A protein has these predicted regions:
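N-terminal alpha-helical interaction blocks
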Residues: 1-33
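N-terminal pre-P-loop "Q-motif" helix
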Residues: 89-112
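SF2 helicase catalytic motif II
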Residues: 188-208
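Residues immediately C-terminal
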Residues: 148-151, 177, 207-208
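Walker A/P-loop
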Residues: 109-133
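Inter-Walker segment of RecA-like/P-loop motor cores
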Residues: 158-195
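Interdomain "pre-motor" coupling segment immediately N-terminal to P-loop NTPase/helicase cores
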Residues: 25-79
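Conserved RecA-like ASCE P-loop NTPase motor core of nucleic-acid helicases/translocases
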Residues: 140-148
């Protein structure tokens, strides 16, 4: 089971039947800083008081309620040598697509944010492939996320074809792969179940 970089609650660990947590760092789910409560999962500073005196975070409650009596279990990021990052996509980028792809690689290498803005069908997904392949070959982890479940469900088979020798985890509401992987496809809110786990995060349909 892939726990590298995971940030989970005790309830989630029980549901996943994780018994060995000796290598996890345990932190309070909510902390009080300068007289203000902050959620350690989503970083929200909008606490709500419960009748029994506990404080809970209302911002990420959809992932399960966290209170001031709860803890988060953070597992150290570790390289998972499970895929070779070989690109098994046999298409060819157009000159304009190649220019955009090269610019993305340069930005990632320099640690800069990068925006690819193009119409539907312009090949934005394919432009990502060389950068992702390079990072996985460098033993780094990549997350492809979107606010929309349908986007992740549509992307999953395309990435599994393009990276046939690299195990891929897919996670969204109602679907939770437990595969060890260097490449994650997930809805955006699933990232709250990770802590400093990825070397590159790509947000698709960022305006959705």
């Amino acid at each position: 089971m892939d726990l590298a970089g995971a940030q989970l609650t005790q309830r989630e660990l029980a549901r996943l039947a994780v018994s060995n947590i000796s290598h996890a760092t345990v932190v309070p789910a909510l902390v009080k800083d300068h007289h203000q409560w902050q959620c350690q999962r989503c970083c929200s500073r909008r606490p709500v008081a419960l009748p029994d005196g506990r404080i809970y975070c209302s911002e990420c409650v959809a992932l399960g309620r966290l209170t001031s009596a709860d803890h988060l279990y953070r597992f150290e990021q570790a390289h998972l040598p499970v895929g070779d990052g070989q690109l098994t996509w046999h298409g060819v980028l157009t000159p304009d697509q190649q220019t955009a792809s090269d610019a993305l690689q340069a930005s990632v290498a320099a640690g800069r944010e990068h925006l690819i803005w193009a119409v539907t069908g312009a090949g934005k997904t394919e432009m990502l492939f060389p950068t992702i392949a390079q990072l996985i070959q460098q033993q780094k982890r990549v997350a492809i996320v979107s606010p929309r479940i349908d986007v992740i469900r549509e992307l999953a088979p395309r990435f599994r074809t393009a990276f046939a020798t690299t195990p891929i985890s897919v996670r969204y509401g109602g679907h939770f792969d437990q595969t060890d992987s260097d490449l994650l496809l997930a809805t955006v809110h699933q990232l709250l179940r990770f802590y400093r786990a990825f070397d590159l995060i790509v947000v698709d349909e960022v305006d959705a």
